[in-house]
Amino acid sequence: MNRIRYCFELVSVLFLMFTANARARGRGAIDFDVNYVVTWGQDHILKLNQGKEVQLSMDYSSGSGFESKSHYGSGFFQMRIKLPPRDSAGVVTAFYLTSKGDTHDEVDFEFLGNRQGKPIAIQTNVFSNGQGGREQKFVPWFDPTTSFHTYGILWNPYQIVFYVDKVPIRVFKNIKKSGVNYPSKPMQLVASLWNGENWATSGGKEKINWAYAPFKAQYQGFSDHGCHVNGQSNNANVCGSTRYWWNTRTYSQLSANEQKVMENVRAKYMTYDYCSDRPRYPVPPSECRWNQ
């Protein structure tokens, strides 16, 4: 009898913990309109689940996009995204940080569609002071079109880290002392769905099949974990304080375990690295030896 009572009480406790966690997750979901605003393709954007989810769509007439109301100088930015299914060659779904102007800074996640049955590419890139050309591509180890997956960008004074489902896949370190520019301008968080058929799939050889339009991508997770800064400023260094958790020593470099996990992912799933592209860069860019 005591054993039965114990089992019943244990199940009851676990149930209460589950429901409490579920409620906490519900309270943590932020409405899109709190931190973001639609910037283009207004008639191609649909708010779902009481504003907790946004669907971007693209047809022959237009794509769509949104951006954060605030500018940031550092932070940890995440978005849950489900990509367009079926034949999406030429279609680009994006999630990135960017400043404005010819000498802009930018930190990119771009998801490059493909023919049905072929893998979508996860492309990352870093622009600093207008200089990009730092593409690295990965094949996801899951189907990004059937469910939501979390994509994250850590940006602090020490490093930029790209995450997929909390797994680090790329690091770009701040090595300004070695003459390599590092993103330091106030940036906004941007998401978009657009026509990239001139370059996105097989170098632009595979064009969009409009018979599959409208293409749709869903976004969730509109919380705000960044240091707000004046968008008119050219300096985000005011956001380097360790009073922000993402700037503390813990996040100044990957742990030994994170480094090992990242190396494993890169060995198995990275399909292109600008640092290894000798026809393009006969001499590898100087930051490459620091970011392996």
Curated annotation (Swiss-Prot):
Contains at least one intrachain disulfide bond essential for its enzymatic activity. One of its GO terms (cellular component) is apoplast. Belongs to the glycosyl hydrolase 16 family. XTH group 1 subfamily. Keywords: Apoplast, Cell wall, Cell wall biogenesis/degradation, Disulfide bond, Glycosidase, Hydrolase, Secreted, Signal, Transferase. It comes from the Eukaryota. Residues 1-24 form the signal peptide. Disulfide bonds join 227-239, 275-288. GO terms for biological process: cell wall biogenesis; cell wall organization; xyloglucan metabolic process. The record marks 108 as: Important for catalytic activity. This is Xyloglucan endotransglucosylase/hydrolase protein 2. Xyloglucan binds at residues 110, 123-125, 133-135, 198-199, 203, 280. Residues 25-219 form the GH16 domain. InterPro entries: Beta-glucanase/XTH, Beta_glucanase, ConA-like_dom_sf, GH16, XET_C, XTH. Its main location: secreted. May catalyze xyloglucan endohydrolysis (XEH) and/or endotransglycosylation (XET). Cleaves and religates xyloglucan polymers, an essential constituent of the primary cell wall, and thereby participates in cell wall construction of growing tissues. The keyword Cell membrane does not apply. GO terms for molecular function: hydrolase activity, hydrolyzing O-glycosyl compounds; polysaccharide binding; xyloglucan:xyloglucosyl transferase activity. The keyword Disulfide bond applies. Its EC number is 2.4.1.207. It catalyses: breaks a beta-(1->4) bond in the backbone of a xyloglucan and transfers the xyloglucanyl segment on to O-4 of the non-reducing terminal glucose residue of an acceptor, which can be a xyloglucan or an oligosaccharide of xyloglucan. It is found in: Secreted, Cell wall; Secreted, Extracellular space, Apoplast. It is an enzyme of class 2 (transferase). The active site is at 106 (nucleophile), 110 (proton donor). It holds the Pfam family XET_C.
